[in-house]
Amino acid sequence: MTIWVDADACPNVIKEILYRAAERMQLPLILVANQALRVPPSRFIRTLRVAAGFDVADNEIVRQCETGDLVITADIPLAAEVLERGAAALNPRGERYSEATIRERLTMRDFMDTLRASGVQTGGPNSLSPRDRQHFAAELDKWWLEIQRKK
């Protein structure tokens, strides 16, 4: 089991939660990005730098993730792909993607893309709140407990 992070867009506060969790759970944490990242020294934490380009990091995560892994991403198409491979997907706000919710999320994403392409100002997501951080940490722990029960 490995925790993969779509690190280019992952908020630093979420990375900090993940660093602590990797140590506590003693699980590999791999941050995939197209730029150099600073991470704390740990035998569980490493970075994987990929070439710059559209979806390069996403494609690498999809290529390497396995059943039972967890992928941290706000990228809905990436979440859909890793779910198909048997991995779990969690966004930085603590929403766990599932087969039931991913289609709805993809449809909404496509709709918003269409609006933006037609010139409508849609705005971006709200800032990450303390409640979002707590929800993320709780969902991460929930995933870990589910994995432990399956052993």
From Swiss-Prot:
Source superkingdom: Bacteria
Residues annotated as transmembrane: none
CDD domains tied to this protein: PIN_YqxD-like (cd18720)
Classification via PANTHER family: UPF0178 PROTEIN YAII (PTHR35146:SF1)
Family matches, as InterPro entries: UPF0178
Protein name: UPF0178 protein YaiI
Pfam family, one: DUF188
Homology family: Belongs to the UPF0178 family.
